[in-house]
Regions:
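Conserved ATP/PPi-binding loop(s) of AMP-dependent carboxylate-activating enzymes
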Residues: 315, 319, 328-353, 367, ...
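AMP-binding/adenylate-forming catalytic core of the ANL superfamily
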Residues: 336-337, 359-443, 447
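Conserved C-terminal "lid"/linker of ANL adenylate-forming enzymes
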Residues: 403-406, 436-488
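Conserved AMP-binding A3 loop
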Residues: 28-29, 138-164
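Conserved AMP-binding/adenylate-forming core of the ANL superfamily
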Residues: 16-45, 52, 56-58, 66, ...
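Gly/Ser/Thr-rich phosphate-binding loop
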Residues: 201-203, 235-239, 249-311
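Conserved AMP-binding/adenylation subdomain of ANL enzymes
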Residues: 161-178, 185-237, 242, 246, ...
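Conserved pre-ATP/AMP-binding loop-to-beta segment of ANL
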Residues: 125-142, 149, 172-179
Length: 488
């Protein structure tokens, strides 16, 4: 495959160039190429069919992932935000027969794997059931979902390489030589952009542990630790979710040394949620080359991305070369040429055209604009339609607001559940008033409730997006009480 051809090429042409690095270890392209075939053979000889991978970010995660791809073994990354119950469900429902990571009940110890970067425990068991997989499946990535159990999206290596090839082409003018992974590698976006794309282009993927970056659990992040990590690990590129972009701007404003170092950035991609154009403008004024993109697991991750050779503020960029985007009559975004192989355990054939569930439009220059989720469109009691994602993106400009979720469907007024930034209670009301001045009357925040959403990780997806139905049910009594004065 293209990925391993490129690694072998750079092992010959630039053997001593760094390919992978962590705080403890570094592997050149030559060393990486020497490590992968024996490790792939070891996994293959063990008779492994489906391997569940539950490790922190680091070189072991990368080496196992790459070796499995080389050996034709299906990799099943276990998302770090899954509860113990969800982890057990994933292991059972996926038919995994091998596990690298912490012990789970019912798994037997096998001979540990000896890697140049250390020893890894290997656990085995015979699956009680083996759900069928689409032919060619190389990875099962689990969507974070908004309701119910997450779905296993089956992807082939060829599909993932098509996405990575397009990304490498779009980012090429930035001449990225080193990338720093800030998101978990279990996230398909970082797996592709933070590991595969650098290796395709001869760059170095720097992979610190999540703890070294300041992450704790699924949604807690210590800003001071992140700032120290960014100072320690100079980089040319980052991939961020909107909340991380907001934090990065705040850190740059408060830390001149960090702002000076980040001036060396050549490409910063942001996705995973709607981003206010004003937030990107602020980043660019600070010298950060931020480009918004869009994608979904069912399409192998990234579908569209702005880049150095073409950028339209407020859009998510032009579609990548490997796929085609069209807009349905009702405004839903449709994607062709990038469909997944199918869902794990589903017999339904995968349509050639993926209905994304997102609403948007293509402008005259071919840039894609996202307006919101089709199922999230809210209609007020006065018949006005609006997408809550739009209001929530505008709220990103309010320093006092850490997270916000808007509810107003069928109601005469909109209620916002707001998680304030620490120590900003006195500023919150003023900033909400300023936000309302920028919004039409039907989209304004009429009532708001302070809530600690990060204390309820089950209410958020892996990248911090709200699980709206769960949030509504969890806080329905408080929301109803807010509206009582309007409806009585």
């Amino acid at each position: 495959m293209m990925l391993f051809d490129q690694i072998a090429y750079f092992a010959r042409q630039t053997p001593h160039s760094p390919a992978l690095a962590s705080s403890q270890h570094s592997l050149s392209y030559e060393a990486l190429w020497q490590q992968l075939p024996p490790l792939a053979d070891r996994l293959q000889m063990a008779g492994i069919s489906r391997l569940a991978l539950q490790l922190d970010n680091g070189l072991p995660w990368a080496l196992i992932d790459l070796a499995c791809a080389m050996a034709g073994i299906v990799v099943i990354p276990i998302p770090h935000f899954f509860s113990l119950e969800q982890q057990e469900w994933l292991l059972e429902s996926s038919g995994a027969d091998a596990l690298i990571g912490p012990h789970h009940p019912g798994w037997q110890a096998s001979d540990p794997l000896q890697l140049v970067v250390g020893e890894l425990p290997l656990w085995r068991r015979t699956p009680a059931r083996l759900p069928p997989l689409p032919a060619g499946t190389a990875k099962i990535t689990y969507t974070s979902g908004t309701t119910g159990q997450p779905k296993g999206v089956c992807l082939s290596l060829a599909q993932m390489m098509a996405v990575c090839g397009s990304l490498a082409e779009r980012v090429a003018p930035a001449k990225v030589e080193k990338h720093l992974t800030l998101l978990p590698l279990t996230t398909l976006l970082e797996n592709l952009t933070g590991l595969y794309v650098p290796l395709l282009t001869g760059a170095c993927s720097r992979i610190p542990s999540l703890a070294e970056l300041g992450f704790a659990g699924s949604s807690k992040l210590d800003p001071a630790t992140l700032a120290q990590a960014l100072l320690r690990w100079p980089t040319h590129s980052l991939v961020l979710v909107p909340e991380l972009l907001r934090l990065l701007l705040a850190l740059c404003s408060a830390n001149p040394a960090l702002a000076e170092q980040l001036a060396a950035l050549r490409f910063v991609a942001v996705g995973g949620g709607k981003v206010s154009p004003e937030l990107i403008s602020r980043a660019r004024k600070l010298g950060l080359p931020v480009y918004e993109g869009y994608g979904l697991s069912e399409c192998g991750s990234v579908v569209a991305l702005n880049g150095p050779d073409g950028h339209s503020l407020g859009s998510v960029g032009q579609p990548l070369p490997h796929c085609r985007v069209s807009i349905a009559a009702d405004g839903e975004i449709l994607v062709e040429g990038a469909a997944m192989l199918g869902y794990l355990g589903s017999d339904e054939p995968t349509p050639e055209r993926v209905a994304t569930g997102d609403l948007g439009h293509l402008d005259a220059n071919g840039y894609l604009h996202i307006t919101g989720r089709k199922k999230n469109v809210q209609i007020t009691a006065f018949g006005r339609n609006f997408s809550p994602e739009w209001v929530e993106a505008e709220a990103q400009l309010c320093p006092a607001i850490a997270r916000i979720v808007i509810f107003g469907d069928g109601q005469p007024a909109n209620v916002a559940l707001i998680q304030p930034q620490p120590g900003t209670d006195a500023l919150l009301a003023q900033q909400i008033e300023q936000l309302n001045h920028r919004l039409p009357d039907y989209a304004r925040i009429h009532h708001w409730l302070p809530v600690a959403l990060d204390q309820h990780p089950e209410l958020l997806t892996a990248n911090g997006r709200p699980r709206r139905e769960r949030i509504y049910h969890h806080f329905s009594r408080q929301i109803s009480q807010c509206l009582t004065g309007e409806t009585s």
